[in-house]
């Protein structure tokens, strides 16, 4: 049985969240009656309202009146008045992943998981399948520049979704094709141990049906170890590793883009194939690896080499993934969502490869618990930055932790050999700090999952005002 067409209204608590908004948009486009609430106004709320979805600002019990089902994310606390009202009225309450799973049952599905790179890889798979005239339905964790949204309803038989592992609910997703980009210690507030994280990813891959396949990056040692543990499922490995089934070769940075080729090896059939002259209009080895995963899926689903080559060259990127927000006197300002040490290191390496000037990193640490649990890693991931500007921790609803703050982070960076680390007293002071540090040819990279994106977009204008 599939989601009945007559069900509704479907009420989303926290509808403006990036994960929730995409599901709500696709359900609305399918013809379901969708409504919701969010704590504040925002771009996603405005976009959904423009589609005719009724959205309340603020959470109140009466908002769920008349709903057939209430959808919540893990960000919604148990004492939320709408959640309490739904349960008091015996309205079914489902998690975000459960509703996503209902949509996935309508199509064949590619699900992209991993600690880092999910959103970009999801966008790349979508772009390639779009170019191959698959007309896929897409639900992503970031705004795809080509669509201007994080979701679209396609008429084709395939769906491409980002699988969020943060609360373990990605195990509910019925994927036919699974991608695993990497597995690092993250979301330990839910999983408790890194062993549990790895076991969840193993289960995610083993949930793929026997007629499907998984695409896994063996450049990552944890993923390589997982490949050896998975039984009775078809695995396609990728990476620069010589043992990979789909191998990234001759990666050459070229300013803001990357050139490379990809070689395919079918061990069972004893055949080999190569796609040469690939160009991705994004810098960084991590993005080339993400593209290799997408190419592996596209090739397996029958796309031609030329289609893959053209689609990749025209890839428009994802908002908040190495996004240029402007320039000032030859200085390039970049906005990036990177908030984990592995992501930060990859983004700064891409910036280093893109310029002969200095790389100035502006970081807004996201969550006290993340900074605490990965403090050593945070203190060693800025090696490609000439200057590190450190803002106050963005709490994301967390209470402060003694000894885990901006100033201790600054001391930690200096203790690990960084010679120029600047504590940012307030966001309004960022322009003057950059004005004094940056020169033509430099890159200023704003990093974090909080409101630092607003600073990144305001910075070019603020710098011009100081001239």
Swiss-Prot record:
ATP binds at residues 114-120. It is found in: Cytoplasm. Its main location: cytoplasm. It comes from Rhodopseudomonas palustris (strain BisB18). This is UDP-N-acetylmuramate--L-alanine ligase. GO terms for molecular function: ATP binding; UDP-N-acetylmuramate-L-alanine ligase activity. GO terms for cellular component: cytoplasm. Belongs to the MurCDEF family.
């Amino acid at each position: 049985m599939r989601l009945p067409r007559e069900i509704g209204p479907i009420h989303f608590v926290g509808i403006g969240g990036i994960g929730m908004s995409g599901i709500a948009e696709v359900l609305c486009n399918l013809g379901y009656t969708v409504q919701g609430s969010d704590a504040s106004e925002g771009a996603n709320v405005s976009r959904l309202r423009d589609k005719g979805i009724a959205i309340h600002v603020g959470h109140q019990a009466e908002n769920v009146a008349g709903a057939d089902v209430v959808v919540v994310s893990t960000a919604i606390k148990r004492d939320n008045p709408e959640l309490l009202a739904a349960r008091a009225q015996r309205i079914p309450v489902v998690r975000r992943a459960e509703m996503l799973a209902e949509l996935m049952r309508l199509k064949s599905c590619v699900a992209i998981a991993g600690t880092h790179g999910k959103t970009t890889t999801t966008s790349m798979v979508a772009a390639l399948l779009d170019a191959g005239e698959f007309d896929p339905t897409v639900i992503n964790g970031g705004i795809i520049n080509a669509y201007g949204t994080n979701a679209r309803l396609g008429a084709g038989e395939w769906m491409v979704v980002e699988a969020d592992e943060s609360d373990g609910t990605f195990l509910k997703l019925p994927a036919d094709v699974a991608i695993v980009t990497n597995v690092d210690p993250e979301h330990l507030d839910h999983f408790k141990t890194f062993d549990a994280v790895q076991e969840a990813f193993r289960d995610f891959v083993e949930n793929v049906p026997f007629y499907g396949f998984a695409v896994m990056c063996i450049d990552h040692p944890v993923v390589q170890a997982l490949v050896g543990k998975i039984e009775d499922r078809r695995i396609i490995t990728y990476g620069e590793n010589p043992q990979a089934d789909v191998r990234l070769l001759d990666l050459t940075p070229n300013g803001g883009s990357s050139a490379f080729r990809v070689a395919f090896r079918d061990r069972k059939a004893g055949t080999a194939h190569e796609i040469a002259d690939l160009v991705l209009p994004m810098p960084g080895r991590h993005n080339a690896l993400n593209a290799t995963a997408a190419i592996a899926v596209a090739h397996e689903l029958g796309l031609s080499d030329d289609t893959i080559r053209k689609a990749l060259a025209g890839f428009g990127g994802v908002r908040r993934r190495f996004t240029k927000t402007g320039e000032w006197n030859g200085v390039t300002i970049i906005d990036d969502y990177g908030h984990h040490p592995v992501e930060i290191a990859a983004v700064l390496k891409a910036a280093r490869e893109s310029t002969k000037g200095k790389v100035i990193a502006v970081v807004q640490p996201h969550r006290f618990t993340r900074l605490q649990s990965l403090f050593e890693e945070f203190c060693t991931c800025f090696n490609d930055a000439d200057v590190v500007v450190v803002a106050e921790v963005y709490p994301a609803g967390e209470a402060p932790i003694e000894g885990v703050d901006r100033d201790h982070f600054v001391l930690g960076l200096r203790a690990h050999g960084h010679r120029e680390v600047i504590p940012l007293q307030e966001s309004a002071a960022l322009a003057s700090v950059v004005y004094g540090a940056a020169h033509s040819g430099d890159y200023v990279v704003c990093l974090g999952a909080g409101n630092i994106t607003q600073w990144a977009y305001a910075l070019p204008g603020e710098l011009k005002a100081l001239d």
